[in-house]
Amino acid sequence: MSNRFAVILAAGKGTRMKSKLYKVLHPVCGKPMVQHVVDQVSQLGLQKLVTVVGHGAEMVQEQLGNVSEFALQAEQLGTAHAVDQAAGVLANEEGTTLVICGDTPLITAETMEALLQQHKEAGAMATVLTAYIEEPAGYGRIVRNENGHVEKIVEHKDANEKELAIKEINTGTYCFDNKALFASLSKVSNDNVQGEYYLPDVIEILKNEGHIVSAYQTEHFDETLGVNDRVALSQAEIIMKNRINRKNMVNGVTIIDPSNTYISADAIIGSDTVLHPGTIIEGNTVIGSDCEIGPHTVIRDSEIGDRTTIRQSTVHDSKLGTEVSVGPFAHIRPDSVIGDEVRVGNFVEIKKTVFGNRSKASHLSYIGDAQVGEDVNLGCGSITVNYDGKNKFKTVIGNGVFIGCNSNLVAPVTVEDGAYVAAGSTITENVPSKALSVARARQVNKEDYVDQLLNKKKS
């Protein structure tokens, strides 16, 4: 197999997005558009990948890191001009170069591989990825001769009436012989309505020089969708969401209502897990097998063990063990580690806490900046008082501790193994192992006080 290279065009300003965010960095199913493209082309066995950047170059470089080399297009003078900026990296290379736009997040490695194979089998100097659509307005048209061979590509604004009737369109993805590509770029003119240097003109240049120009028509037009505004962004989101949901269902995940379930492109979900409506799984989340998630649950960048149930709750940047029960209406905040067989019940908030195996906080509790041992029971209304208005402090609760209802643990404080804290206590000092700590005012009953009070009011 000859050397393979790729150029991703990501220099456009994206003015139609009307956004401060650089166009190709707008996310689709939680991942920037250009990252989707890079992830797919990286499966093609490339020797070099060059991303052409312009406006917002630093942000794109930060996103892609060392996966790609970069070339700067300081002025946006057209797609041919953009590709020519990669000459410093690729011009002297021999092989095949794939050119693709960074705003086509739905393209797949399979389609690009088919394009590369067509290019090789045809012995072509250039091969264009085309599609057939009923309403081709806005797209460049593929002009073929009487033998069906590609003659040229005409941009919509430059097309005559006959060419506008053509329904085979240019998707903006190409293969070129690398040396032929860079030799032809200097011959491209900007004598057109837009006054730009069009990459499709290279097709006509190579054809006129007697080279073979080929085309590969894809049946998957949705893969070629270019995102230029928020409407197209929403369309790409829907298509990608359906693709991700289908992949998970094929792999054994039950999704009760796919139209109302959102899974990020990088999430991994085990078989026999059930996702209820309103579930949103974001980032690099990993969910085990036999779990039940939702309804109306958000999980972001977290690891969820097997046989765990999360209902109507939010989990961010945390790790949950096996057979954990969360919710309804619980909030597990970042940097929390929840052990196995744990119960985090309704209206419980946990933040930056290690919560040991088989421990329970069943309702109405806040546990922050804490280390909770195994087999601990936190009664209703148990609170770790971790903040003094300036600094955060740690609470340590040992194994087998019982915390009574409506108790405050004022950090920094330690409740040692096996200790009990009486309901209604405010604990400000360490509690020794197996001690009972009572920190509340003694109850006083005033006999017949109510009758005396009522009689006093009548008089």
UniProtKB/Swiss-Prot annotation:
The active site is at residue 363. Residues 1-230 are annotated as: Pyrophosphorylase. Pathway: Nucleotide-sugar biosynthesis; UDP-N-acetyl-alpha-D-glucosamine biosynthesis; N-acetyl-alpha-D-glucosamine 1-phosphate from alpha-D-glucosamine 6-phosphate (route II): step 2/2; Nucleotide-sugar biosynthesis; UDP-N-acetyl-alpha-D-glucosamine biosynthesis; UDP-N-acetyl-alpha-D-glucosamine from N-acetyl-alpha-D-glucosamine 1-phosphate: step 1/1; Bacterial outer membrane biogenesis; LPS lipid A biosynthesis. Its cofactor is Mg(2+). One of its GO terms (molecular function) is magnesium ion binding. GO terms for cellular component: cytoplasm; membrane. Acetyl-CoA binds at residues 386-387, 423, 440. UDP-N-acetyl-alpha-D-glucosamine binds at residues 9-12, 23, 73, 78-79, 140, 155, 170, 228, 333, 351, 366, 377. Residues 252-459 are annotated as: N-acetyltransferase. One of its GO terms (biological process) is regulation of cell shape. This is Bifunctional protein GlmU. It comes from Bacillus anthracis.
